[in-house]
Structures are given as structure tokens and as C-alpha cells.
Amino acid sequence: LVVGAGPGGYVAGIRAAQLGLETIVIEGDKAGGTCLIRGCIPSKAIIHAAERFESLQQHASEGGHMGMSVSGEPEVDMGALVSWKDSIVKRLNKGVESLLKASGAELVKGWATFSGPKSCTVESSDGPINIESENVILATGSSHIDLPFMPCDEEFILSSTGALDLKKLPKRVAIVGGGYIGLELGCALAKLGTEVTVVEGLDSILAIMDKEIRRPLELWLKNHGVVVHTNALARSAQIK
């Protein structure tokens, strides 16, 4: 029994089934986990779209460079961009489900509650399913943590998950945290035309990384008008 169909869980489930074990993989959301559903894949899709938009803007400003012209100013339809991103995620999600099926592992969608070390009940759309297993792998992944003074409402105060599902492009955004997740989103939004401010509590962005890695990004942020405040702590947020 594998609880969680992320990159740890579904790979473990596939391998167990290939080795001849009767295998069930339980997933409460979608197969693929954080990286595929709400992390690396969707963020890279949005970054790719932002790069295309930035190139269009640059080409439009050059007025017909290389014999090619763009009529009017390029515009972003954020809802359409997110729908395109979702189509990529959906296709890859189906791919993971197909891999599980091909290996002989059974995917059960629902949330597992354990009543004992090797006994659980899954609340699925078809009703409760009781499962007894000889071995259990817990690969439940993680979720964002709300700041007590700045809880996410996913409308004005967004988690990284909510930021990947924007329906409208914000004029301005403040990103709390100068790690790679916040900066990925910040760079994409800056390319799309949003005014971005980054608030970082330590003395530099990407503080755990080498200076040789940080410096090119610091210059990029400066050149793209991204305001970075270091040694600064967010204390609250007000919606006006």
C-alpha cells in the first residue's frame, strides 16, 4: 500500500508492482504530486509563456526587425495562459496514471485514514474502501504553511499554489520570501508586466546558494525593475 502518488509514491508503487507485489496507490488529489501538479511543471510552463511574451514585446518595440512586425502591443490573457498551463498538467497527470496501470498497480482516489499500522479506510467518490496491507509506504508530500499574521485567502494573499492559478494579471505584487519558489514566480510576473517587490528576511536573495549563482539573478532583477528588500520582515498585510 502506497499513500500518495507524487514522485516518491507513484515510482515506489510502479516498482513494487513490477516486482510482483499486489500494489494499491492512494491519492487524494491528482497523480503526479507537487512537482507535476503545483510546482516545477506548471511554474516552468508559465515562465516559458512569460519569456515568449517578453520576446514579443521586444520585437514589437523594434518596429519590424528582420522583416517581421507585430501589429499593436502584445497583450496577456492570464485566464487563457493558465488554461494552457492546466492542459499540460492534465496531459502529464494522465501519463502518470497510465504508467501505474501499465505496471499493474491500482490507483485509488481518495483520502486514507489509518485505524491500525496496516489497516486504513479510503474515503473515495464511490464510498469508503477498507484496505488491509502487509507493507505501507507513506509518501504524503507537503503543503504550504500559512503565516499566522498573513493567512492565505487565495484571492489577495496567495500561496505558491494560488499564484499558479491567477485569472487576472496583477498590476503589483509583493512576494514574501526570496527563495527559488518566490523568485521563479516573481521573474515570470515581471516579464508579463507586473510590478514586483520581493521581501527577504536574510541579507540576500537565495541565501543558501553561492554568490556566483546569486549575482547574475540580482542583476537581472534590477534590470527588470524588480524591487528587492533584504533584512526585512513582513509583519502583516492589509487589503485595500
Predicted regions and their residues:
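Glycine-rich flavin
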Residues: 14-21, 26-169, 202-206, 212-215, ...
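Glycine-centered short loops/turns at secondary-structure junctions
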Residues: 20, 193-195, 225
